[in-house]
Amino acid sequence: MIAVLVDTTNDAHLLHKVYEGVENLTLLVNPTNNEVDRVLRERPGETLMCMGHGFSGGLIAESYYTGHGPAVAVGDRNIELLKDRKLICIWCNADGFATRHTELEGFFTSMFISNEMEAALFGFDAYEDDIFNEVTLFAERVNRLIKENTDLSEWPAILRGQAAMEKDYVRFNYDGLQYKGKKLKKNVRNPEPAGMNK
């Protein structure tokens, strides 16, 4: 498994618990898009996990915050190298990235409240300590699913069953979890000539 963590904020830092103790892991912390590209080419077909802040265009790179280099660590530019592998995409609006690229397969978060500012922006009354605790619990739950080799298609339902859904922002986060399978192009068969059906 390849793990990419863009660890530039306190809430993103909590996501290191997702891969803690996972065996046979290639870890890239704050990589450039080129570094991600190189590792994807070296390890075709290997599951890729991406974590941090993002949008429907991809996982935001450290360079977005510094103003030096491309703003995206994983995004449209990598799409050909993302198609033939399973993905675990944990960033805000990762599901939008998958919607734009229907050939992708994996587990995707939607908007995911991970700090007090995001909670306020979406009208939730929640404190940073509680939010950080919930992010940590989410990371630990995902870690367990990885170690148990649970099929990605089962993740959303399992995670919802473990969450404190009575908290409005937690329910918002977990309701947005999705598994997306590949959308295969329909193979339109030529109709058989008359009289060939027996």
Which residues make up each language-model segment?
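Short acidic, S/G/P-rich loop/turn micro-motifs used as interaction or catalytic elements
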Residues: 9-14, 32-35, 53-62, 93-97, ...
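A domain-level signal for caspase-like cysteine endopeptidase catalytic cores
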Residues: 1-51, 86-90
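A diffuse structural propensity rather than consistent per-protein peaks
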Residues: 32, 72-75, 151
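A short, glycine/acidic-enriched catalytic loop
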Residues: 55-83
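Active-site-proximal C-terminal subdomain of hydrolase catalytic domains
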Residues: 86-198
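Short, surface-exposed basic-aromatic patches at helix termini and helix-loop junctions that form
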Residues: 20-21, 41-45, 78-82, 98-109
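Short, low-complexity, polar/charged sequence segments that are solvent-exposed and flexible
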Residues: 22-24, 45-48, 67-69, 106-110, ...
